[in-house]
Amino acid sequence: MAIERTLSIIKPDAVAKNVIGQIYARFEAAGLKVVAAKMAHLSKGEAEAFYAVHKERPFFKDLVSFMISGPVMIQALEGEGAILKNRDLMGATDPKKAAAGTIRADFADSIDANAVHGSDAVETAQAEIAFFFPGMNIYSR
């Protein structure tokens, strides 16, 4: 497998539960390295721009409202097969369908408040990382 980078967001519900460290421990145990990170409280404009791909979907307004409801922890992860590895760690979008031991099964409350976001492909990972970490704010280790 190739070394990849992926974007991960720990959403407001998980930040409020104070489980950032537990989620980071799972990244590291899976061989993923945090190569950039920041905490932010997204503006409505930032959330709308980031999730623009979903603009015509019925859940868009609720998604934006949720993502601006509190601070988020945003990180770029790096490692072999990072995109799929992170998606496996996250579990299914709906925590009721997520496998036991996944981040969403353990920390998410609902399909809306589902604890984490992760890039779904190489192209989206590149765009999402560039959105939050433009330029030289990423440090391979």
Curated annotation (Swiss-Prot):
Active-site positions on this chain: H117 (pros-phosphohistidine intermediate)
Function: Major role in the synthesis of nucleoside triphosphates other than ATP. The ATP gamma phosphate is transferred to the NDP beta phosphate via a ping-pong mechanism, using a phosphorylated active-site intermediate.
Keyword annotations of the record: ATP-binding, Cytoplasm, Kinase, Magnesium, Metal-binding, Nucleotide metabolism, Nucleotide-binding, Phosphoprotein, Transferase
Reaction equation(s) it catalyzes: a 2'-deoxyribonucleoside 5'-diphosphate + ATP = a 2'-deoxyribonucleoside 5'-triphosphate + ADP; a ribonucleoside 5'-diphosphate + ATP = a ribonucleoside 5'-triphosphate + ADP
Chief location category: cytoplasm
PROSITE patterns in the cross-refs: NDPK (PS00469), NDPK_LIKE (PS51374)
GO molecular-function terms, A-Z: ATP binding; metal ion binding; nucleoside diphosphate kinase activity
Annotated GO CC locations: cytoplasm
EC number: 2.7.4.6
Keyword Thylakoid: no
Protein family (similarity comment): Belongs to the NDK family.
Assembly description: Homotetramer.
Lineage: superkingdom: Bacteria
Protein's organism: Polaromonas sp. (strain JS666 / ATCC BAA-500)
Cofactors demanded by this protein: Mg(2+)
Designated name of the protein: Nucleoside diphosphate kinase
HAMAP family with a match to the protein in the record: NDP_kinase (MF_00451)
Gene3D superfamilies: Nucleoside diphosphate kinase-like domain
Keyword Cell membrane set for record: no
InterPro entries reported in the protein's UniProt record: NDK-like_dom, NDK-like_dom_sf, Nucleoside_diP_kinase, Nucleoside_diP_kinase_AS
Binding-site residues for ATP, renumbered to this chain: K11, F59, R87, T93, R104, N114
One example of a Gene Ontology biological process annotation: GTP biosynthetic process
Record's subcellular location: Cytoplasm
